[in-house]
Amino acid sequence: MVNSSPVPGALAIFGTASDVGKSIVATALCRMFSNAGIDVAPYKAQNMSNNSGVTPDGCEIGRAQIAQAEAARVVPTADMNPVLLKPNSDTGAQIVLQGKVCSTETAKGYFLDTSLWAEAARKSLDQLMQRHELVVIEGAGSCAEMNLYDRDFVNFRTARISGAPVILVADIDRGGVFAQVVGTLAVLPPEDRALVKGVIINRFRGDIDLFRDGVKLIETLAGIPVLGVIPYFRGFRIDAEDAVPLSSKVDPSGAPEKGRIAVAAIYFPHISNFTDLSPLELDPKVELHYLHFPRSLRGYQALILPGTKNVRGDLDWLTSLGWAEKIREFRRDGGLIMGICGGYQMLGATIADPSGVEGEPGESAGLGMLPVHTVLEEEKCLSNAIGNIQGESIAVSGYEIHMGRTTSNGDCSSFLRVTARNNRPADDVDGVITPDGKVIGTYFHGIIDEPEVRCWFLRQIDPAYTPDAEERGRQESYDLLADHFSGYLDIPKLYEIIQRPCPNP
């Protein structure tokens, strides 16, 4: 449905490339508009990410859209990310359509005909625009991929049908910002080029005054205003969309710093929900290393096996590279090991995939550290759940996204007592923990987000651990992000673009 109102019902945030900061810009704007009293909601037609979450009504969408909904102070729904692609191989992905698993496709097969996905995305956008005053649309990748332009329903096609003005985001930190902006605009068709109303230069380092001439040059060459130059800022805790920025932190050359709790996490080829580890990464008393290639783990006190979208494939990778023996050695040395979702399955005795859910049918031997057996099934478990650590008065909350059913032979205790799923009472258990407390498995993503759980986990390593008194929660992080952007954006011009009264500074 084309928006015929003279006042835009949407604002589109597109990028000159992948990982220029579109998600963060959209999150900041959602909180800024919400703070101004605007009923705002996020939207991304198609997201390619293994970093997903569960909405309150049991649908799976990208973590970035859940964060944006939190920033906008609205309940996340499947309409905010109607098409989610979860890569499970170099050329294929599981397709989640409006919150539920739809099929598995190769990249070639997916792009042969995108009409089904485009229509679902359009319907979701219509729903959001009917329910909310303003929708902040996030684009995908570069908005000017000309070889895919006729099949791209995420960027300018969405802007056209919604009547959304477009703000173009460029990343100056990677260099070539003039070519990013001017080159992107140069290849766009005139009707789409006319929709672009401003530019945001993201991730600036140094003295902004030294870039004033650069701003003028971009405005002259592009013919549109630069709405702001946003300095690089790390002072907030907000879930990332995918593992692109994470890859630059993998396999650090140095040993863990003494005086901090050293935690290693295996960086699987198909790693998913790596935001499970973000609270550890942000804790000043913890040093977290993502490791892809095998090394001795003797300098670390804890090891985490995170989720993966291809459990048996990544288990084969783990074994073939020699990680399995390194992990067993770490176990013999008394290290603390936690497996989350796919990592939990790997720690078990066997993983069977009789239906070929994640690849070729078959069964794989696990690492054998937990007495559990997993069978992958076609129906995906999606839930938000709460409970407590067995034998402890520590409340836990998390979300489950998995296609496996794991059973224990009873030689270990259950890790969690589950008291509710999707707001319905439950009397269930999750995960296992060995008698010595050194190996833990759980399906709960986000479990370490809870300060009490994180404190409990780190005190298994260092009983004297105390959390940072200045730790910021998610809502405070959204406010900090909005304040940061507000300080560098041309707010009157931004409100002129969306044709709303500018709030008082």
Curated annotation (Swiss-Prot):
One of its GO terms (biological process) is cobalamin biosynthetic process. The active site is at C341 (nucleophile), H445. Transmembrane segments: none annotated. PROSITE patterns: GATASE_COBBQ. Pathway: Cofactor biosynthesis; adenosylcobalamin biosynthesis. Gene3D superfamilies: 3.40.50.880, P-loop containing nucleotide triphosphate hydrolases. CDD domains: CobQ_N (cd05389), GATase1_CobQ (cd01750). GO terms for molecular function: ABC-type vitamin B12 transporter activity; catalytic activity. Pfam families: CbiA, GATase_3. Keywords: Cobalamin biosynthesis, Glutamine amidotransferase. Belongs to the CobB/CobQ family. CobQ subfamily. Catalyzes amidations at positions B, D, E, and G on adenosylcobyrinic A,C-diamide. NH(2) groups are provided by glutamine, and one molecule of ATP is hydrogenolyzed for each amidation. This is Cobyric acid synthase. It comes from Chlorobium phaeobacteroides (strain DSM 266 / SMG 266 / 2430).
